[in-house]
Structures are given as structure tokens and as C-alpha cells.
Amino acid sequence: MSIILGIDPGSRITGYGVIRQVGRQLTYLGSGCIRTKVDDLPSRLKLIYAGVTEIITQFQPDYFAIEQVFMAKNADSALKLGQARGVAIVAAVNQELPVFEYAARQVKQTVVGIGSAEKSQVQHMVRTLLKLPANPQADAADALAIAITHCHVSQNAMQMSESRLNLARGRLR
């Protein structure tokens, strides 16, 4: 059993999603947004750090998964996003959590089956996969999708390792 915290970073709204994985079974534990309503960036970063730390304390995850930085058209926005990611990662590292990063395209490909999927498609698939009563808020859905991606990637990696081990032992399944 593993608990995975997914983070969709943003300097104004940071989405989070927490799921439990037991084998192939995924269970929704919680999700939401850390909203930073203050204007100055250092205060927003402090709120993100405190919010992520509080979520880690509440849910005690085993793994921390976060969206990678993408190339933005606006350099200022990209820098702020990078700083928001940084404080979220520091919160995880301070709690000694292993950190995994996934590209947005990989997350969409894993959850929806199309790397260029729209936000509404991600919300719908997250709702379906986790058997939620309604679509989660967009940032929370993205964070849950990141956590789901981590589950699939880590499970596939374990299966490949087992296959390699069996091959090395002369057994093919």
C-alpha cells in the first residue's frame, strides 16, 4: 500500500490530490487547492510551503509527485511557476519524501490516452478512475492526475524489473 501526493504547482493556485494505491486499486483520499490571495511573491511562496507541509502532515504520503516545468510564453510566469514548484519540492524534501516529476503531456497521455487532452477531459477521467461523484476542480484534478500517473509509472517499472529478473533466471512468462 502506498499513499501518493500529487501537486499541480502555481504561484496563485496550487492544486493537490492524494490517493492510496493497493496493487492496481486506486482510492481517493482528498484534494483541493492552496490559494494565495496576497500580492507579493515571497508571501505567496511562504503560503505554498506552509500549505504543502500541512497536507504532508495530514495525509502522511509515501511519495510526492509534481508536474515538471514547461516552456511558457511569458518568462515572468515561468519563473514564478518555477519558484512555486521549488518551495513545494522543499516542503517534500524536508519531510524526507521521494520526489518524482512528470511532464504535463505524459500525465495527460497516462490518464486520458491523449497527450494534448483538454482540462475538461482530464477532469472527467480523474472522476471516472477514482469513482468521484462529480468532476474535481481543475487544479485539484490535475494534481490527482499527476498522482495517478505516478502509480502507473511505478507499477510498470516494477513489472519490468520482475520481467528482467525472470529473464535473468531463465524464466519467461
Swiss-Prot record:
Binds 2 Mg(2+) ion per subunit. CDD domains: RuvC. Its main location: cytoplasm. GO terms for cellular component: cytoplasm; Holliday junction resolvase complex. Its cofactor is Mg(2+). SUPFAM superfamilies: Ribonuclease H-like. One of its GO terms (biological process) is DNA recombination. Homodimer which binds Holliday junction (HJ) DNA. The HJ becomes 2-fold symmetrical on binding to RuvC with unstacked arms; it has a different conformation from HJ DNA in complex with RuvA. In the full resolvosome a probable DNA-RuvA(4)-RuvB(12)-RuvC(2) complex forms which resolves the HJ. This is Crossover junction endodeoxyribonuclease RuvC.
